[in-house]
């Protein structure tokens, strides 16, 4: 099922006690990714999902990582991949989710599901964050949520 929900969100930095905006000292790929995951998590919680876990990793090399594990009110477990790109010059955020990346996410999800005696229904969502999340006076980003973006078959 392919449909998306888009929303522009203002992710301006919070002011400090002195009124000045608190910006990160150095913007790194990791800090951008962390900001995108935080924005995606807040967006999904606002849409009614419940946060379970962030950055679940399988042990050992060659495993996978799940950015967010969420649950919808009907009990479905949602494995969320968050992708952020500040520009579309290299195809945008969605273009970076290859078949190999999907297989790694599915592998990690199967590992995660081993903790359950009976398997809950689950799906794989993608949240795309288009635009810059840090820097500038009023940074804007558009969040696009793709429920059931791919499946494990």
Swiss-Prot record:
InterPro entries: Restrct_endonuc-II-like, tRNA_endonuc-like_dom_sf, UPF0102_YraN-like. Gene3D superfamilies: 3.40.1350.10. One of its GO terms (molecular function) is nucleic acid binding. Belongs to the UPF0102 family. This is UPF0102 protein Pnap_0271.
